[in-house]
Amino acid sequence: MTARPLSELVERGWAAALEPVADQVAHMGQFLRAEIAAGRRYLPAGSNVLRAFTFPFDNVRVLIVGQDPYPTPGHAVGLSFSVAPDVRPWPRSLANIFDEYTADLGYPLPSNGDLTPWAQRGVLLLNRVLTVRPSNPASHRGKGWEAVTECAIRALAARAAPLVAILWGRDASTLKPMLAAGNCVAIESPHPSPLSASRGFFGSRPFSRANELLVGMGAEPIDWRLP
């Protein structure tokens, strides 16, 4: 991640929303450069670390929270749960998300694991921790990203615009108090990981429920269809 002003790294609305933690973003850039200098790599690629914030802040209607990026080299792309179009097999959490997607919405399985269309249509795919060491899950937790992503979530919640937060798992559910302000509703269920998907994620209908809530709040529903 290069040392550049926040306004050059993220979308204009996000630059304003994240201004209170601009120094922390710069600090995290220094942390990542120090990791590289020490011979330690990180994921995703530097240009994708803040990718979730390159889509318009004002367009966000749904928030889907992940924990940290996929630690498998080649998987993390800067959007929670998403992978590059050429990645196969899909990570098991993503495969379970797609199983629920087809069951909930009746759409066929997507042709690939790229969730960029959701991001383009108003879904913020945000990991609480934005980087990870390859093959070392949770290795960057507690290093400082949480302050950045919590600022982002509070900024979304403070808007007057409707927001549906899809909170999968216990870690994501701890964010619920931050969403108490504004016009926000949370959908909670177990995480789509293989360890917990059968305990209530399957059958939770997060996509159709999110749209029902958005329409009820006077907002446009999300077009969830993937190619």
Swiss-Prot record:
GO terms for cellular component: cytoplasm. GO terms for molecular function: uracil DNA N-glycosylase activity. It holds the Pfam family UDG. It is an enzyme of class 3 (hydrolase). It comes from the Bacteria. Its EC number is 3.2.2.27. Signal peptide: none annotated. Keywords: Cytoplasm, DNA damage, DNA repair, Hydrolase. InterPro entries: UDG_fam1, Ura-DNA_Glyclase_AS, Uracil-DNA_glycosylase-like, Uracil-DNA_glycosylase-like_sf. It is found in: Cytoplasm. GO terms for biological process: base-excision repair; base-excision repair, AP site formation via deaminated base removal. It catalyses: Hydrolyzes single-stranded DNA or mismatched double-stranded DNA and polynucleotides, releasing free uracil. The active site is at D68. Belongs to the uracil-DNA glycosylase (UDG) superfamily. UNG family. PANTHER family: URACIL-DNA GLYCOSYLASE. This is Uracil-DNA glycosylase. It comes from Mycobacterium tuberculosis (strain ATCC 25618 / H37Rv). The lineage of its organism: Bacteria, Bacillati, Actinomycetota, Actinomycetes, Mycobacteriales.
